[in-house]
Amino acid sequence: MADKGTENFDLEGSSWYIVHEAECTDSIDTLEDLCDESDSNVSNLIDDDVVDQGNSLALYNAKITDDCDNAIAHLKRKYNKSPEQAVAELSPQLQAVKITPERNSKRRLFQEDSGIFEDEAENSLTQVESNSQTGGNSQDGGGDINLLLLQTSNRRATMLAKFKDWYGVSYNEITRVYKSDKSCSDNWVIVIFRAAVEVLESSKIVLQQHCTYIQVKIFGFSALYLLQFKSAKSRETVQKLMCSMLNIQEFQILTDPPKLRSVPTALYFYKQAMLTESFVFGQTPDWIAKQTLVSHQAATTAETFELSKMVQWAYDNNLLEECDIAYHYAMYADEDANAAAYLKSNNQVKHVRDCSTMVRMYKRYEMRDMSMSEWIYKCCDECTEEGDWKPISQFLKYQGVNILSFLIVLKSFLKGIPKKNCIVIHGPPDTGKSLFCYSLVKFLKGKVVSYVNRSSHFWLQPLMDCKVGFMDDATYVCWTYIDQNLRNALDGNPMCIDAKHRAPQQLKLPPMLITSNIDVKQEQSLMYLHSRVQCFSFPNKMPFLDDGSPMYTFTDATWKSFFQKLGRQLELTDPEEESNGVPSRAFRCTSRSNSDSY
């Protein structure tokens, strides 16, 4: 076994920097002696006390709690939006700073103001902060609600909650929302908060000049109004009116139109009107009366639409055009149950077209079944005005036309005698030819045809539905066309007319009135028309008054007086004489049951 100890290797010349063993000294034996003999002035430099354990567990719990709080705050900041009011309190300029621009949903870009209330879930994150110390020292007792409205971040939610507590119904259940302040309505529900009682009482009188119906219920310093204005108003106009009248601000007002088709809404206001604390002025609005009042009409309400009733109504009112029937029958829905059922129908266009077709058929048959005398007296009966026939006589005399000659030609014209079935009035321009003829055709409910439509196969079709036809300002080309194609039309004999959507119709054309600047009988190229027309010349220009109106005017009342005065000379027979005094039965196209009574 090798010897214990340190083995040294002798290296020449290295003894001066290689230390092989520590040198022992006996001058200082212990650490205490070293400290005692030190020349340092610092006492107790080394802490030699016993080390304590301490409360390390509490320190650990505090650190874990801080870490959890920071993690929860990070999650809240990530998933919860900061309240808008808090941002505004930090800085007004900071509220306007937005990193991401706001974008509206595409499905709402073109949404109209339909009045349908949207879901309120989108506003559910809005925080409502209220001050617990509000209005405790108010002298008038109503300052608490005003201060509350000013201090809350969502004023509308606070106002809706107060309204439901005071009036026992939700505001959104009795109103429909207008998104735009420009939308107009006749009826408005208005809720006022924090207004003087004296001003609220005086508004009952002031509003009467603006409204046809007023219902006011005052509760403390608030009031509920149901108003029907004389003319439609927007929300802006209503707010300005109430603010100026009650001396309040716009944030103290809730205003929206009521739900006009809601039965609970109508019943609510109907019940409020019967309370003693409610003030009512005017007649109950129609939308409330229809849904609350019982009438005899409810027993006869039509479950389905009946076309025959619509046809009978259009026939009685002498409505033939589709636009007239559609518009006036829609307005009739307030009075007639069948018209109301028509508005609910999805086939309104078809019903209007069918109604117009049926009325035209009935009217066409009646016209064809009447003689010319009966038709003229029928036109006279429909004219309710009274006039004088002398302007016609004076105008003919002014134009140099013998009144007796005119009556003889007109008598043959009205009878439709062949070869005497057409009257031509010719002369220079501005002589009153068209004015004279148009007034006569209008009174007799005649039809006008134009040569410009000659290229159409159906340009003579209007002559099938009239007693008198009229063609204005016939040129030489037009006379040439008549000479080549329409000689038998002027004869007064039956001819074939092409009708649209029907087979060609064979009938006798009605008597024709034609105005022209050409004297047909002076044109030898139109010699075959000389025997088919009766001509009158109007050589003198129509005189005018200082205001620009013609001196001679011809109205329906003028022609009514003319035919009544000269009916015997024209050999017109009175329909009462033909029927021997027996009244004719009115036309009816609806079926009536035995239980119907009026």
From Swiss-Prot:
Region (DNA-binding region) residue spans: 138-302
GO molecular function, one term: ATP hydrolysis activity
Post-translational modification: Phosphorylated. Sumoylated.
Phosphoserine: residues carrying this PTM: S82, S91
EC numbers on record: 5.6.2.4
Reactions catalysed according to its record: Couples ATP hydrolysis with the unwinding of duplex DNA by translocating in the 3'-5' direction; ATP + H2O = ADP + phosphate + H(+)
Keywords carried by this UniProt record: ATP-binding, DNA replication, DNA-binding, Early protein, Helicase, Host nucleus, Hydrolase, Isomerase, Isopeptide bond, Nucleotide-binding, Phosphoprotein, Ubl conjugation
Compartments reported by the entry: Host nucleus
Domain of life where this protein originates: Viruses
CC per GO annotation: host cell nucleus
Residues joined by cross-link Glycyl lysine isopeptide (Lys-Gly) (interchain with G-Cter in SUMO): K508
Positions of region (Disordered): 573-598
Quaternary data: Can form hexamers. Interacts with E2 protein; this interaction increases E1 DNA binding specificity. Interacts with host DNA polymerase subunit POLA2. Interacts with host single stranded DNA-binding protein RPA1. Interacts with host TOP1; this interaction stimulates the enzymatic activity of TOP1.
Family label: Belongs to the papillomaviridae E1 protein family.
Protein name: Replication protein E1
Species in which this protein is naturally found: Human papillomavirus 65
